Each structure stands twice: as C-alpha cells, then as structure tokens.
Amino acid sequence: MRVAITGAAGQLGRQLVAAFEADGHEVRGFSHDDLDITKPAALFDWDSDVVVNSAAWTDVDGCARDPERAMRINGEAAGAVSAVAAACNALIVQISTNEVFDGTLDRPYHEDDDPDPINAYGRSKLAGEIAVVAANSRHLIVRTAWLFGPGGTNFVTKILAAATHAANAGQPLRLVSDEIGNPTWTPDLAAAIVSLVTQDDRRSVVHVAGVPAVSRLGWAQVALEAADIRVDVDPVALATFERASTPPMRAVLAPSAGVAEMDWRPASVECARGLPAKPNA
C-alpha cells in the first residue's frame, strides 16, 4: 500500500513511518514543514491508499488558552485532511484521545461510550472525529492516551529530571496520585495501527492504549525504581495543580477486542535506564 502520514516528524509520526516501512509499504511522511494540515491539498500529489493523520496540537494548556486555534488545527483541519483522502479514495486514520471523555466513569471507557470532553483539547479532538467521519466513509478513529516514545522528551525523562533536581535540592517530588490513565509506548501503538489498517474487518472506532491503567504517581514510581533514583515523594491531588487546562481524572480506555496487549512497563523501565526499548512482541 501507499501510505501518507501527517505529523511525520512527531513522537508518534516517526514510529508510524518506521512501522509501515518495516511492513513493506511505500510511505510518504509529511512533517509540519512539508504540509500545513489546515491546507492539505499537497496530499493530492501523493496517490495514497491510506492517510494517517497524526498531526495535532497536543499542548493541552495551549489549547485552553487559544481554543479557536485548537479547533482550527484539531477539528477543522482533520476534516480537511479526511476530505482529501476521500477524494483519493483512501482510508483516513485519525489519531484521537482519551480526553474526548470526561473521566467520571468508575470503569474503563469503551468505543460506544458517549464522549463528553471537559477541556478545549478534548473538545477540539472530538470535533476532529466528527469532521473526519462526515468527510470520508472510509475512516478509522484510533483513540489512545498518555503517549511516550524513544528519543527526545517524554513523561519518563521529565520525571527523572524532576526527581534528580528535587533530590539534589533536598526536596520532595510532588506527583499526582488521582489522575488515572493508560501510558502508551509509541512503537507499540504504531505497530497496532499497521495491523488494524491491514485487516479486512476493520471497525470505525478503536481504542488502542497501554495496560494496566495506572496513576501518574504509579507510572513515575516504575521509572524511578528502574533508574535507581531515591527521592521522597509527596502524593498530591490533581486539583492542587494550577493549570490552564483540567484533564479528566479517570479517562481510562478499554483496549478494543483483537488489539494486541501493550504493557507499558517494560518500555518505561528500559526508557528510564537509557536503553533502546523495543515494541512488545
């Protein structure tokens, strides 16, 4: 297949390019410099069978401060990319988020649960889902959560840096104990998307996220133990952090049936130790 990937220079986009190429597909990756997704006509130059839209504005606090820009990029532009894919008779794969849910259920969210976002980022991503579906009957919405990947900065590397600073200063490390989610290793997510795209019995909406669900505190503790960093930890409530955007407290995704289990813990350990973690087998 010929596969076009937007956001190809991003944390997930790089892994998508690698995963589709490893599976033998012809891939064209479009970075932000290559393609403004609010004006996606350049996609017509690449006659694709599949378009994966991983481009997004994921700065949740930025989205809260400028919801119109969030809606333009995450909502309207997603629909425009989907329309170009439809004109090329291509499948559109839209990457979405657990933040389309409000996080109030006492169980994980399934694909058929009603979205009800509580922040500007979630609202813009839900608008993107709706626009993608309206523009292209051949669509696959992939909801995921708490992405972290090799190279660059991610939750694990940020926690290790913060813990080292706190330990050197003789201060406790404050960690949120009541926000629960699914850490998701981007190589695992990319491999799952390749598998989903090549299936004959594709669904229209799937949840692809790491297991088991965990708090930010619990995730951090796995990384700290792996890196052998000793620091006093001060568990705090999400509400004590002043932020422009309020994340849902428990927007845990139930991975869809048939999606390979993706345990986030081995990758977190390897990432914390500075080793090249690989996708789950």
What are these regions (language model features)?
Residues M1-E21:
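N-terminal Rossmann NAD(P)H-binding glycine-rich loop of SDR-like oxidoreductase domains
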Residues I229-V231, T246-A281:
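C-terminal amphipathic/interface module of NAD(P)-dependent oxidoreductases
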Residues A41-G75:
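NAD(P)H-binding glycine-rich loop region in Rossmannoid oxidoreductase-like domains
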